[in-house]
């Protein structure tokens, strides 16, 4: 059985990514609005809908869409959710590979294709092995890894940001009230908000685990509410901390979060902290992979068992886990990593 806090943490790591913080930090105080608008029009409504549907129809996206539009459209919905994640896994694990390169004190290693491919393959199959062991191990690994690899680094950034302001260090972004409004650059501004909407995707992915709660009707809405609050905490305040202290030109597209922490640690004479926090960030990203591996594939199994997919893909192991889907999924990711 899962607990409310475990399911909430799995939802947080499925949605909130520390990787995106440096890019948003470039907008300074305006990042608050750029986070809140998508939260109001997408994150919160999605959370409310997921909580409502999960209390009435267990099984996640496939079951919800099937009940409204029939089996085939339900299958299409879960297929789209599943396939877009299959091609995302190598990207997320490549971020882990970059973080691990800072653990070894070799940041440039993240540009080595052989190293990145090897890390993708090893960690993806490790995630798959965790998922194949069933709900208890999956929930523990995902929630604990998310706690120390996502929440803790986010809170540390907040503390660093507060200290930076308190001791009067130079602030790298404007603190004027006018800076709260993002610059209007036409269609590009709308695209930015839409991209942040996509950054909030995933609130519904763990609805397939609602039945693993002792009292799904009461506990799933609580888990979603807690996850929503934590997601906003993880994204908004740490972004501001980075904006206050780190010039944007010093942040890379992939390793930006690692460079941001290095800036803080070096400034405070704690250079030893960079490899430690990079390891924790890698662990948090690993938790997100674990969460996404177990979610859509379980929903796809529900569709497969209606006869919409071959019997081989309906196979489950002794832990009642969708082995017939996870193994082919791993093969696809391995091929993508080798390209």
Where are each of the predicted segments found?
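Membrane-interface "cap" regions at the ends of multi-pass membrane proteins
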Residues: 1-51, 55, 174-179, 183
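Hydrophobic alpha-helical transmembrane segments in multi-pass membrane proteins
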Residues: 10, 35, 39, 85, ...
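Hydrophobic transmembrane alpha-helices that form the core helical bundles
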Residues: 25-26, 44-124, 128-132, 282-302
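Transmembrane alpha-helical segments of multi-pass small-molecule transport proteins
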Residues: 5-11, 104-136, 150-158, 326-332
